[in-house]
Amino acid sequence: MKGCDSLDNLKKTPLYEIYPKYNAKIIDFAGWAMPVQFESIISEHEAVRNAAGLFDVSHMGEIIVKGKDAFPFLQNLLTNDLSKLNDNQVLYTFMCNHNGGVIDDLLVYKYSNNYYLLVVNAANIEKDYKWMLNNAGIYKVEIENVSDKIAELAIQGPKAEEILQKLTDEDLSQIKFFYFKDKVKIAGVECLVSRTGYTGEDGFEIYMPNEHAVTLWEKILEAGKDYGLKPAGLGARDTLRFEAGLPLYGNELGEDITPLEAGLGFFVKFDKGNFIGKDALLKQKEQGLKRKLVGFEMIGNGIPRHGYEVQADNQKIGYVTTGYFSPTLKKNIGLALIDSKYAQIGNQIEVIIRNKPLKAVIVDKNFYKKNYKK
């Protein structure tokens, strides 16, 4: 095992013990010892785009909300509209503070009007859980943080369904995009399986008790060995989500960045009644956005990185939220949060790389066309 020296104080997923077998390079991610890569970020990225990759995402948090008032409680807590959700459907949404900033972005799994599973970002588990408890008020709900009991694997890529199908009698083609099925037997283990992911490709996220994670990881890799399936780390997960224009909390979203500034207003439903942050977001919408998230492509050499300054007219207009050499597009591209008046597609900006202003042009931030099965 290569990478971080002081792993002792970090949290570990149930798969940590077998990382050395796969030559994982370990980093500290939000207090977790996680594989940034196995073979290489680029080869893992390409495997997901062309065949499939298997990710350990057991660091993600799971919080159950149940009880008579589960629906009205979540409808008030979250920006998206849960009234449109069918049983066994998944919803992407934000949990905002009273200023409209994002406490977290998350997935809601609806079992029924009085039972939901929320899947939250690893760095925000405790913060989210406290925020939910603090806002429970008069609602008759039970809120349980079950993150420590549940492991999660994600198989992503055009061959994901074909590979996973080898391990189950369940017809996976019947699980539609952003739907899930519980108690699906994968290699004999009862799992929750959803057609969701964070790569821009088709695929599944699989939730199971911790004690079955190692077995399932190895069984899935074995089933996919003739299909080009590779174990994939957080490095490829980040380049994949970035190409697909999907936000990362702490980069494109945060308590100081609203969903509207991030260009994700679609997931904020102003017509659904009251919710925390609504007034601030409505005011921002009516007054017009001062900042916008944009995509850009470097004209010259130079790879933009998170935090780099962006300039126009010889003044600072914002900063890079994420930047990479795109393995799929073979270009240096980035996302930046900048002054709205410079945010038109086609505008030239400059990114300060090693103290030099390098030219870039604003482009559509969905760099890669998503290949979801709908």
Curated annotation (Swiss-Prot):
Keywords: Aminotransferase, Transferase. It is an enzyme of class 2 (transferase). GO terms for biological process: glycine decarboxylation via glycine cleavage system. GO terms for molecular function: aminomethyltransferase activity; transaminase activity. Its EC number is 2.1.2.10. GO terms for cellular component: cytosol; glycine cleavage complex. It catalyses: N(6)-[(R)-S(8)-aminomethyldihydrolipoyl]-L-lysyl-[protein] + (6S)-5,6,7,8-tetrahydrofolate = N(6)-[(R)-dihydrolipoyl]-L-lysyl-[protein] + (6R)-5,10-methylene-5,6,7,8-tetrahydrofolate + NH4(+). Belongs to the GcvT family. The glycine cleavage system is composed of four proteins: P, T, L and H. The glycine cleavage system catalyzes the degradation of glycine. NCBIfam families: gcvT, PRK00389.1. This is Aminomethyltransferase. The gene is gcvT.
